[in-house]
């Protein structure tokens, strides 16, 4: 089974172009399943799963009684342990995807998780930032310092484009056409799209690329955004920096880099951009995913009306 899990993780990385964040989640979820089966005696004990190939220890451990009942029992254990509904749903999705891969590879005859449903999640609307909050956040990095300049540049690109954090991390120099203000993005499932970037963001990118410290540190000739070692920056590094800027800015609420994506989508809609264009810019495969921003926009208008109306 362990060899099959590693084969699945390699498939996600090489064929499906899964992001490092996605791979970590799959590894975490399947490691939990592995430990559960080991504790029940359905699987021989082994080392924890590793994403790095050189750290892997693979022995021939067969699937033993990996049935629908075992998947149900594992999900029940997660619920009993107080895991969040979203975590449980993600974990079940990981198991379903892995089992589906095993069926295709003729390792399993059927998918034991296929008909199992996870907990229902309440519909939560994204909470975008206000224009004022965006300005406060943008002003937080110290642009007189190299890393502050890089982080301001990142924020400008986030807000200009609505890119996912994994897409920004993957951006290369050759993906930018600075003369036409266009950027080529390879999104989920290797889907490619070309989107415009604001003049303001382009100016920040040019300043950042020409900074002497960046040129001195550069060890990855393709990547645009570098870490302190001159290598391509990671999503985790961006998350850490982002949380530090939030702390310094004094902004409250649950705000992440993905919040900026929700924010610009909402601001585009409020400025009159049509849903099909927003869908294309964000790289949504379904218009239904984009439609949620109409609900967010209506919610914000109601809130503003309540706060401003003298008879409210």
UniProtKB/Swiss-Prot annotation:
Whether Nucleus counts among this entry's keywords is no
CDD domains per the UniProt record, alphabetical = INT_XerDC_C
Q: Where is the active site?
A: 164, 188, 258, 261, 284, 293 (o-(3'-phospho-dna)-tyrosine intermediate)
Q: Name one GO cellular component term.
A: cytoplasm
Keyword Cytoplasm belongs to the record: yes
Family, as annotated: Belongs to the 'phage' integrase family. XerC subfamily.
- Describe the subunit structure: Forms a cyclic heterotetrameric complex composed of two molecules of XerC and two molecules of XerD.
Please give the name of this protein: Tyrosine recombinase XerC
The UniProt gene name for this protein comes to xerC
């Amino acid at each position: 089974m362990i060899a099959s899990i590693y084969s699945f993780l390699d498939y996600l990385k090489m064929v499906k172009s899964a992001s490092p964040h996605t791979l970590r989640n799959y590894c975490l979820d399947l490691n939990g399943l592995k430990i559960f089966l080991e504790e029940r005696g359905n699987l021989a004990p082994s080392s924890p799963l590793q994403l790095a190939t050189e750290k892997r220890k693979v022995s021939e451990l067969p699937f033993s009684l990996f049935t629908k009942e075992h998947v149900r029992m594992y999900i029940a254990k997660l619920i009993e342990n107080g895991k969040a509904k979203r975590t449980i749903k993600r974990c079940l999705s990981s198991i379903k995807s892995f089992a589906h891969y095993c069926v295709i590879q003729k390792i399993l005859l059927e998918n034991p998780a296929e008909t199992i449903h996870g907990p229902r999640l309440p519909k939560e609307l994204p909470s975008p930032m206000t224009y004022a909050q965006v300005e406060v956040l943008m002003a937080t990095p110290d642009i007189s310092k190299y890393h502050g300049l890089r982080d301001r540049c990142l924020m400008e690109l986030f807000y200009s484009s609505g890119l996912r954090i994994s897409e920004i991390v993957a951006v290369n120099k050759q993906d930018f056409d600075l003369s036409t203000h266009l950027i080529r993005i390879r999104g989920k499932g290797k889907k490619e799209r070309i989107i415009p970037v604001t003049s303001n963001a382009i100016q920040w990118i040019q300043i950042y690329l020409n900074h002497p410290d960046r040129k001195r540190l550069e060890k990855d000739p393709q990547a645009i955004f570098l870490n302190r070692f001159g290598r391509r920056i990671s999503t985790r590094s961006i998350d850490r920096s982002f949380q530090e800027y939030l702390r310094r800015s004094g902004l409250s609420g649950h705000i992440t880099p993905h919040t900026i994506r929700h924010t610009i989508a909402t601001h585009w809609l409020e400025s009159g951009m049509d849903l099909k264009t927003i869908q294309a810019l964000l790289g949504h495969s379904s218009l239904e995913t984009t439609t949620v921003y109409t609900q967010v926009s209506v919610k914000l208008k109601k809130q503003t009306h309540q706060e401003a109306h003298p008879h409210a």
